[in-house]
């Protein structure tokens, strides 16, 4: 919208792709339309007046030195490699996590995790990340 109104827009993304948690959601079964929406957004970045910088972290000093009239900060988050998010206050760590073999939903859905045939999905938050990951694993024939 800002570019359509004649403003120069610069979007800075720390990762190599845009989408963050939406991309994870789109990797889950029956959610491919989310990835299609992200692809549409990426095509919008090709419009005149919009510059997209991927793989770029900005420090506060760089933001302060930028000649922008308006800065919108949408920081997102980075998941823990194990996927443990500590939703339950009394669990500072996941018991047994140091033994290894614990993977984040992101690693599972990107097929980076080396899993056996039997898998336990621990969803301490009770949200879409755990359910969607369990669904994807079931579709892969995991028990």
Where are these regions (language model features)?
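N-terminal Rossmann-like dinucleotide/flavin-binding domain of flavoprotein oxidoreductases
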Residues: 20-65
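Short, Asp-centered acidic motifs that coordinate Mg2+ and/or phosphate
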Residues: 70
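Rossmann-like dinucleotide/flavin-binding elements
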Residues: 1-15, 53-65, 74-143
């Amino acid at each position: 919208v800002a570019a359509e109104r004649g403003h120069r827009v610069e979007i800075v993304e720390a990762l190599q792709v845009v989408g963050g948690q939406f991309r994870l959601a789109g990797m889950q079964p029956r959610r491919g339309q989310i990835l299609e929406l992200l692809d549409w957004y990426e095509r919008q970045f090709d419009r005149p007046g919009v510059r997209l910088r991927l793989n770029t972290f900005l420090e506060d000093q760089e933001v302060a030195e930028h000649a922008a009239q308006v800065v919108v900060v949408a920081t997102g988050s980075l998941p823990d490699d194990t996927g443990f998010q500590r939703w339950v206050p009394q669990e500072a760590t996941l018991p047994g996590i140091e033994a290894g073999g614990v993977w984040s939903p992101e690693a599972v859905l990107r097929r980076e995790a080396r899993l056996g045939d039997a898998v336990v999905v621990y969803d301490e938050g009770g949200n879409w990340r755990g359910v969607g990951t369990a669904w994807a694993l079931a579709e892969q024939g995991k028990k």
